[in-house]
Amino acid sequence: MQCALYDAGRCRSCQWIVQPIRDQLSAKTADLKGLLADFSVEQWCAPVSGPEQAFRNKAKMVVSGSVEKPLLGMLHRDGTPEDLSDCPLYPDTFAPVFATLKPFIARAGLTPYNVARKRGELKYILLTESQFDGGMMLRFVLRSETKLAQLRAALPWLQAQLPQLKVITANIQPVHMAIMEGETEIFLTEQQALAERFNDVPLWIRPQSFFQTNPVVASHLYATARDWVRQLPVHHMWDLFCGVGGFGLHCATPEMTLTGIEIAPEAIACAKQSAAELGLTNLHFQALDSTQFATGQGEVPELVLVNPPRRGIGKALCDYLSQMAPEYIIYSSCNAQTMAKDIANLPGYRIERVQLFDMFPHTAHYEVLTLLTKTR
């Protein structure tokens, strides 16, 4: 991938960009095999990759500069702003949105937040696009509600220019820290969720729900999990750390009972909406802590699927799963290091299958799907 920002030394986020994708995949595979070297792996599946550029469905832009000439991008370590509107990781559909947002910020009088001075209102612009219908969700992350009336008043102009903006919100983040969003979300449109669809499975994206940023590879990841589950004699499963329900909704069948657990209520609202659309009445999604839910149960299903954050599932959940011993565990991880540590705490299981998914090209990061089977 060619990137003028990288070539000019203005951005180094894609640290592996000079390596061909083939070499990147080889390095990631070697890293994963090194982390799992202490375990016997029955089957290594071929890694899955997607497009090298224009693959992201989400942009997280720091707003800097002045209200008349805002910059959308990032701040370097020394506080110097960098405009990343032309980043080649974003699809072509993002450029006209960024170009329109800059004069809109001036129209609405949304002064960019100045980190050094602790002054200003607009901290971030968060933009998400649906691959299903091209609809977009735009979130203005503000320091306070001071400029909310001005934002509302100027909004009709923006919506006329960019009718693809289906969901628009103001998120209030009052803390002087590099935190992307606050707890308060104020909807500025009637529509509150973005429709998405992977592999003919309806999914929904709400403002404070996690959603994978690489739709092509994520679609392969969910489809692979579905295929693995269909090969197992499973009638009841848990989907822990389930997010908007991507794994569970793909794996579920009308005959299967599935419980999905996720701590974020916004994500659970999305999962419930999808389950209702699919007409699957044996799917139950609850907004709870996954570890607390699991360890509070007196019995487990045949299959437990986990998709934890980077920290992994942790020793308490590993100990519980070891004790209760479900027949199968499917572990989806964005941090193979913590996954390997967790697997070491599951001594009663063998690794039947592993597959790497290159969700984050040009970086050292990747996603991995692992099937663990109870040793007889």
Curated annotation (Swiss-Prot):
Molecular-function GO term, any one: iron ion binding
Active site positions: 334 (nucleophile)
Keyword Iron-sulfur attributed: yes
PROSITE patterns noted in UniProt: SAM_MT_RNA_M5U (PS51687), TRMA_1 (PS01230), TRMA_2 (PS01231)
Catalytic activity: uridine(747) in 23S rRNA + S-adenosyl-L-methionine = 5-methyluridine(747) in 23S rRNA + S-adenosyl-L-homocysteine + H(+)
Enzyme Commission number, as recorded: 2.1.1.189
Binding site for [4Fe-4S] cluster: 3, 11, 14, 87
CDD domains listed in its UniProt record: AdoMet_MTases
Superkingdom of the organism of origin: Bacteria
Residues annotated as binding S-adenosyl-L-methionine: 212, 241, 262, 307
Keywords: 4Fe-4S, Iron, Iron-sulfur, Metal-binding, Methyltransferase, rRNA processing, S-adenosyl-L-methionine, Transferase
Any one biological process term the GO annotation gives: rRNA base methylation
Class in the EC hierarchy, top level: transferase
Function: Catalyzes the formation of 5-methyl-uridine at position 747 (m5U747) in 23S rRNA.
Name assigned to this protein: 23S rRNA (uracil(747)-C(5))-methyltransferase RlmC
Organism classification: Bacteria, Pseudomonadati, Pseudomonadota, Gammaproteobacteria, Enterobacterales
